[in-house]
Amino acid sequence: QSGQLCLSLMDSPGIRFSYSISAGNCAVTEMEDYISFLVDDEDTKVVAVYLEGVRNPRKLSDAFRRAALKRKPIVVLKAGRSEKGGKLAASHTGSLAGADKIFDALFDKFGVIRVNDLEELLYTAQMFAVLPKLPTLPTFASMNLSGGETGICADVGELCGLSYPDFEEETLEKLRELLPGYASPANPLDMT
């Protein structure tokens, strides 16, 4: 819903888009129509959206439901978290922008990933685009280059609801063969 942000995203090196759509104020078609189209498009692996508001919440919910059934990730940068931001977004698009907690509930219900800035929107969408298949559980393995990174990774993961399961014995044996003797083969993994 922003021409300038659309141009900024298109200028991102190393990221390929099947479509880059600027809906503007949605005078002819609604943002929900574009999201619905991208959910059904076979060439689109991930739907990344800058969203100010919607006019038809039911249509948006239906698109999110279909994406969840297809296991197609939707990543949203939603404007209007603050009172002032909500008013600005509503005046820009003339759509339902407020009630941010309602959007959060809708995102949670259908597994839509909400991000906080453009960089996070791009990197999250890119991560899902290159994954061979989506994870079925909120578990994660991480490999880091320092003890500091490893500690931060463990903390941030827990804050985000991720768990780092212990490696299977077969994996531990392989890591012991590959890592220097002073390295501890645990998850998250410190490579130093």
Predicted regions and their residues:
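Catalytic-core regions of core metabolic enzymes
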Residues: Q1-T192
